[in-house]
Structures are given as structure tokens and as C-alpha cells.
Amino acid sequence: PNISHLKNNMVIENLNKYSEEQIASLQEKENVIRLIISEQPNRCNLEHLRKYAIKSDTNIQLCLCAEDNNIIKFDVFECLAEKVVDIEIYNRKRVLTSIIGISIFRNLNKLIISDLYDDKIVLDELVQLEKLEILGLVLNGDLDMRQYETINQLFSLRRLEVKGLDSMLLDKLPNLENLKCHNLKDGTQLGYKMPNLKSITIYKSPKIRDLNFLLGMKMIQCIYLYGLSNLSHVPNLCNLPNLRRIGICNMKRLEQMPTLNRELESLDVEKNVPMLGVDSFRDVTPINLPNLKWIRINLGNDVKSNMILDRFKNICETTRW
């Protein structure tokens, strides 16, 4: 048996090896139990856990990391289902083909499916989960049409991470606040489809030829751009009144920093931005950015980086790393 405490969670591994007496002795203080599931769990031990360790305000996180997560059947967790608020499924060795049965977790708030999973995995049951706010389909295939149909019905979503998103295929998601896109295909409708978006992160997306769609995001507070190496230009962002943070990383063709609004608080530019020189930052000054609290500039050259950072010395926090 393996039990530990991490970030205010009680973490339980190898539950199948626990005796009833050991489970009865568990002292859960943080009201969060994180179950690490690497094999089909023993139903009796789950019942014991419910009997001895689960309180009225206990929340359960399930972390599925078996060699083949397809062998883990959700119905075995039925006795704990109402307490499960978070499910993370990491598929490092075998492709996950199904999440059938996941709708028993009526209080599920967060679902992450990572690494190897069937590109066409059926998500239909998620529509029944009215409290689902966070969905991540991470690092595998692009969305298919049936998956779009499901996502378009997840009106409670606040955070979404996906690959291959095409905004033309989305319906309005009025509650979405945080979007992470890998290989974004089309972003032209994001401002309209996600009117309350506050944070957007865009990773390597070779089909994106410009970022003008950012200008339609009137509620946006944070913009992070990573690996958009085919873009030489970011539009001026000074008319985004709520923008407070921007990060730019690994944009090897970017030639000029965009104009930023005076309310900006955090600026981060680093890693493989060879076309950016000191002159590219001519408007990055304390006068133009009077509310800046933190700035990182790493142009791969200490002298050039420091020439920009020194403008903010003793004004805000500065770093190259």
C-alpha cells in the first residue's frame, strides 16, 4: 500500500493491496482523495473506502494510468461516483478506444484525456455531465465532426484544450474563458463563438497565416503564442482593453513587437526569436507600459536582452530566465 499527501491531497496508490483494516485507518484531512489507478480496482476495497474514508464534503480525483486503460471499467466506481469531480486518463502505452460509462459521474467537473487515444473516440456521454467545466483532449488527433457536435453542447465548459480546432465548426460557447489550441486550423470566429474568452494559448499551428482574429476578443486578458514559426507579424493589440499578459516563444520569423495597451502587467518574450532585435522593442518602455509588473526578455544574447530590461530596472521585476 502506498499513501502520501501532495498539494493538500491524500494520494492513494495500489488500493487493491490494502486490507479493510488499513483502509479503515486512513485519516483524510484535506477533503480531497486522489486515487491512482493502474489496474482494475477491487470493488470491495472501493466500498471500504466509501465506508471509512469518504465524508460528506470529500472530493475524489481519479487518475487512470494503467498500461491499458481500456481494462478499467467506470461502473466499478459506482459507489464513489457522486464524489468524483476530476478524471485524468493518461495513455502512455495503449490507445484508449472508449469512455463508455463515464456519464455515471454526475458531478464531474474536469476530464483530461492525454497521449494515446482514438482520434474518433466517442464523447457523446459528456453531454449528460452538466457540471463539466474543464475538458482536455491533449496531444493526439484533431477533432472529428461527431466530437464537434458534442463540444457544441457542453454549455458549462469554462476551459478547453484541443488539437486541430476549426472555429468555423463551433457553435457559441458563451461560458468558455480559457482556450488552449494545438495545431489551430482556423481562428477567425473565435471572438464571436467565445465572447467571454479571457485566456488563449496557441501552440504550433502552421495553417494560421495571421492573428487578426485576436482583435475580436474584447474580454481577453492573457495571450500566449508558442511555436508560430511561420508568422512574421502580430497585429497591434493596444485596442484590447483587458489585456494584461502576453507571452511569445519560439516565433523565429517575428520581426517586430506589436503595440501593447498601457494596462499590460506581464510581458514574456523568449527562445528562438532571432529576427527580433533591440529596435523591435522600441515601444516597450516604462512610459508606454506604466503598469508593467514583470518582464522577461531572452533574445539569445545577454547584451541585447539587457538593453531592453535595463529600461525597467528598479521599476518592475525583470529577468532573462
Language model: regions and residue ranges:
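Concave beta-strand-loop units of leucine-rich repeat
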Residues: 11-19, 31-48, 56-76, 83-101, ...
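N-terminal amphipathic/basic-hydrophobic helices that include classical n-h-c signal peptides
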Residues: 1-7
